[in-house]
């Protein structure tokens, strides 16, 4: 039987419906305003935390599940290295009444590096824009205006003539200014080597939890890039501080604490620059009369071309007895009197990144995906084996003997004995182990000091 409607109820519905619609609309508008305000407030929240609040790091999880009910904010860091440009999009969350946590990182890399566009600046904008699109895809629209956007260039641009480097940076700045993110006048810069090392040290100690508690043991950082190499650690021995040469110590203020770090960057001792020096070439200059560069560190049967910093070199190996010894002798000449050795370094736990990892993984010294630990002597053993079998078992890379020998002797110059254990990792808790995370801390802290409002 069909139910007969109650007309009194119908009259009430006619009144209640528009009233409910208005109330619902009011609540929706209020929510949108609050949501946008929370995005702007995120800038102040993270800046304040970077200056004085202890940060914590939690296990990686999906952005949605990790941030429900928390304040959410983001930071974007471009790493313009010598061999490629990389974007890091960091997501942070602050639970009510607690300190912020890192909840997600998006990472993407493009090759070649910015320095490859030194004579065609307009082309550099294409890759930057492509990476910016990655940030837009992973950051909600409402947070764009409150998200700091920064690019820091490293050794690749430091090695370029000043005018060329500045033109590239200006083009990137133009692209950044046209983006919807939070962009300051200092959003694009060339990072000095010490800052690079310190920022990487912050990253690894943050991710390992060493920065959470005052007095806890920290770890050291070794990074081997294409154009430069860095070593950074926190000395515990007063003699280390007193014996350090000028420019090897830097003070870092973070989390209401002051860290006096031993940190130095050796420009020209990155793996690619070292290759050129070992071959007898000069940075940025073609060989005279297109002369072939011959080295005992290359396979005796190898003859080919190698491009570095936009210059192509003709290179070849040489037939000789005792190739490892000859190669090691040449590498030692390149490193002679260029690296400061500190006694304390051998007693500090170190993480090693970048080409240290890549070479170790390539020759089976660590798991290519998970990383792992090895002793410094493993590089020497691998170098001797590869160099002594160059003629009978040529490796897939013509530079294998050279690179392994260089890394082995570089670590020796730093003062590490053969039985010193190093930890090699690309990621810690799924976060890229680069200087990018540490650098974004520094940048946000500087914004707070300048009292820059979120847009």
From Swiss-Prot:
Disulfide bonds join 297-327, 387-401. It is a single-pass type II membrane protein. Its cofactor is Ca(2+); Mg(2+). Its EC number is 3.6.1.6. It is an enzyme of class 3 (hydrolase). The active site is at residue 196. Residues 33-455 are lumenal. It catalyses: a ribonucleoside 5'-diphosphate + H2O = a ribonucleoside 5'-phosphate + phosphate + H(+); IDP + H2O = IMP + phosphate + H(+); GDP + H2O = GMP + phosphate + H(+); UDP + H2O = UMP + phosphate + H(+). Glycans are attached at residues 192, 256. GO terms for molecular function: CDP phosphatase activity; GDP phosphatase activity; guanosine-5'-triphosphate,3'-diphosphate diphosphatase activity; IDP phosphatase activity; nucleoside diphosphate phosphatase activity; ribonucleoside triphosphate phosphatase activity; UDP phosphatase activity. Pfam families: GDA1_CD39 (PF01150). Residues 1-12 are cytoplasmic. Expressed in heart and brain. The chain crosses the membrane at residues 13-32. Keywords: Calcium, Cell membrane, Disulfide bond, Glycoprotein, Golgi apparatus, Hydrolase, Magnesium, Membrane, Secreted, Signal-anchor, Transmembrane, Transmembrane helix. Strongly and equally activated by either Ca(2+) or Mg(2+). Signal peptide: none annotated. Might be cleaved at the N-terminus, retained in an intracellular membrane compartment and in addition be released into the extracellular medium. GO terms for cellular component: cell surface; extracellular region; extracellular space; Golgi apparatus; Golgi membrane; plasma membrane. Its main location: Golgi. One of its GO terms (biological process) is response to magnesium ion. It is found in: Golgi apparatus membrane; Secreted; Cell membrane. Belongs to the GDA1/CD39 NTPase family. Catalyzes the hydrolysis of nucleoside triphosphates and diphosphates in a calcium- or magnesium-dependent manner. Has a strong preference for nucleoside diphosphates, preferentially hydrolyzes GDP, IDP, and UDP, with slower hydrolysis of CDP, ITP, GTP, CTP, ADP, and UTP and virtually no hydrolysis of ATP. The membrane bound form might support glycosylation reactions in the Golgi apparatus and, when released from cells, might catalyze the hydrolysis of extracellular nucleotides. This is Ectonucleoside triphosphate diphosphohydrolase 6.
């Amino acid at each position: 039987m069909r139910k007969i409607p109650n007309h009194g109820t119908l009259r009430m519905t006619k009144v209640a419906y528009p009233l409910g619609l208005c109330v619902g609309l009011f609540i929706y508008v209020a929510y949108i305003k609050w949501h946008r305000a929370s995005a702007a407030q995120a800038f102040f929240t993270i800046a304040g935390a970077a200056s004085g609040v202890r940060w914590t790091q939690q296990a990686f999880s999906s952005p949605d599940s990790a941030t429900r009910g928390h304040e959410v904010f983001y930071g974007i860091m471009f790493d313009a290295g010598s061999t490629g440009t990389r974007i890091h999009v960091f997501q942070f969350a602050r639970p009510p009444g607690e300190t912020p946590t890192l909840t997600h990182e998006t990472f993407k890399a493009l090759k070649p590096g910015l320095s490859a566009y030194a004579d065609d600046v307009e082309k550099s904008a294409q890759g930057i824009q492509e990476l910016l699109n990655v940030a837009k895809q992973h950051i909600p629209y409402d947070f764009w205006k409150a998200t700091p956007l920064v690019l820091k260039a490293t050794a690749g641009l430091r090695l370029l003539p000043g005018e060329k480097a500045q033109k590239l940076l200006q083009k990137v700045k133009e692209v950044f200014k046209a983006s919807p993110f939070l962009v300051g006048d200092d959003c694009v810069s060339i990072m000095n080597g010490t800052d690079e090392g310190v920022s990487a040290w912050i990253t690894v100690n943050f991710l390992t939890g060493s920065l959470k508690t005052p007095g806890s043991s920290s770890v050291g950082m070794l990074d081997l890039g294409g154009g430069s190499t860095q070593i950074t650690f926190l000395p515990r021995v007063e003699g280390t501080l007193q014996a350090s040469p000028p420019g090897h110590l830097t003070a870092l203020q973070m989390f209401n604490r002051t860290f006096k770090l031993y940190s130095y960057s050796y420009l020209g001792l990155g793996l690619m620059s070292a290759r050129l020096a070992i071959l007898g070439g000069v940075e940025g200059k073609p060989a005279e009369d297109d002369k072939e560069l011959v080295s005992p560190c290359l396979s005796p049967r190898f003859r080919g071309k190698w491009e570095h910093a936009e210059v192509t070199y003709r290179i070849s190996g040489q037939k000789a007895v005792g190739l490892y010894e000859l190669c090691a002798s040449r590498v030692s000449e390149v490193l002679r009197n260029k690296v400061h050795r500190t006694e304390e370094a051998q007693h500090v736990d170190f993480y090693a990144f970048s080409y240290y990892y890549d070479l170790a993984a390539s020759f089976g010294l660590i798991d290519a995906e998970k990383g792992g630990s090895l002793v410094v002597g493993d590089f020497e053993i691998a170098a001797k084996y590869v160099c002594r079998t160059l003629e009978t078992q040529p490796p897939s890379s013509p530079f294998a003997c050279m690179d392994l020998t260089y890394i082995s002797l570089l670590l020796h110059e730093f003062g590490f004995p053969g039985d010193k254990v190093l930890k090699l990792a690309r990621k810690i808790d799924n976060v890229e182990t680069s200087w990018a995370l540490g650098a974004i801390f520094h940048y946000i802290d500087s914004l707070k000091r300048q009292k820059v409002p979120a847009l």
